[in-house]
Amino acid sequence: MSHRPILKNFPQVDHHQASGKLGDLYNDIHDTLRVPWVAFGIRVMSQFEHFVPAAWEALKPQISTRYAEEGADKVREAAIIPGSAPANPTPALLANGWSEEEIAKLKATLDGLNYGNPKYLILISAWNEAWHGRDAGGGAGKRLDSVQSERLPYGLPQGVEKFHLIDPEAADDQVQCLLRDIRDAFLHHGPASDYRVLAAWPDYLEIAFRDTLKPVALTTEFELTTSRIRKIAREHVRGFDGAGGVAWRDMADRMTPEEIAGLTGVLFMYNRFIADITVAIIRLKQAFGSAEDATENKFRVWPTEKG
C-alpha cells in the first residue's frame, strides 16, 4: 500500500512543469515583474490553456510601468495589521543555533516575497476586474503622464535569484503538517508559494506560525487589513492606460462554459488569497524590526519623489 501524503499538491502547472511557450511566459513574468517566483494563482490558472497568455498580454504593458510600481508600494504600506507588533524571533533562532548570516539570508528572502506579493495583488485585481467587464484600466479618459509611464528595468534585481519552492508532497511529515496547519488556520486551499519557500527553514516557520501568524488569523483586524489593500489595488488598476486583463465574454470562443465558471471562482479566490498572503508575510518581516522596514520597497528603481 502506497504512503498517503499528509498534504496533497493543489492542481497547478508548477515551475518545473512549465515548458515551451508556457515556460517562456513564466520567465517573462519573472523578468517583467522583477520577482523570483511565479504566483500560485498563475500556476493554477495556467491549467486553463488560453487565459493566462491572453490576460498577461493585456496586462504586461500596464504592470511594467512606474505607475504600477507605485500602486504596489501603496498596497505594501497599507498592509500592517493595527495593534502591537509581533515578537521578534531572533532570540529563538539564535538559541536554535542560527548564525547572523543565516538570519540575514532569511530576512532577504522575506524582502523578496514582500516586494512581489503587492505586485501580484495588483495583477490579480486587474485580471479579476477585467474578467467581469469592470474598469481595469483605459476607462478614465486620462492617460499616464511621462513619469508614470516610465518602464521598469527588465529582469530580476541585482543579486536576486529565483526561489526554490519545496514540494509539499515530498517534504517530511513535520513540514507537511506545518504547511497544512498554516493553510487551515487561514481557511486556504493549499500552501502559498511563500510558505513553500520558507519551509527551507522549518524551525523558523514553526516559530513564525505559532507566535506571529496564528494569533491574528481570521481576526477582524486581519480581515479589515486585507480588505483595505484589495480596495487600494482595485482602485489603482483603474488608472492603467488600457485594460489590464480580458473579459470572459471575449474568451467564450476559446473556453467552455464550465471553464469560464471554474475560472471565475479561481479569480475570486486568489483575489482574497493573495491579499491574505501579502499581509501575513509583511507581518513576518515586521517581527524582525519595524513596520517601516517591513513595508519598504527594498528593490526601488526610482526615488519616492521624482527629482
From Swiss-Prot:
GO molecular function: (R)-2-haloacid dehalogenase activity; (S)-2-haloacid dehalogenase activity; 2-haloacid dehalogenase (configuration-inverting) activity
Alphabetized InterPro entries for the sequence: 2-haloacid_dehalogenase_DehI
Effect of D194 to A/E/G/N/S: Complete loss of activity
Impact reported for T219A: Less than 10% activity
EC number: 3.8.1.10
Pfam families referenced in this protein's UniProt entry, alphabetically: DehI
Result of changing K119R: Almost no effect
Outcome recorded upon mutating Y120F: Less than 10% activity
Span of the signal peptide: none
Effect of W37F: 40% activity of wild-type
Membrane-crossing segments per the record: none
Annotated effect of mutating E69 to D/N/Q: Complete loss of activity
Chemical reaction(s) catalysed: an (S)-2-haloacid + H2O = a (2R)-2-hydroxycarboxylate + a halide anion + H(+); an (R)-2-haloacid + H2O = a (2S)-2-hydroxycarboxylate + a halide anion + H(+)
Outcome of swapping N271D: Almost no effect
Keywords, ordered alphabetically: Hydrolase
Family (UniProt): Belongs to the HAD-like hydrolase superfamily. S-2-haloalkanoic acid dehalogenase family.
Role: Acts on 2-haloalkanoic acids whose carbon chain lengths are five or less.
Subunit structure: Homodimer.
Protein name according to UniProt: 2-haloacid dehalogenase, configuration-inverting
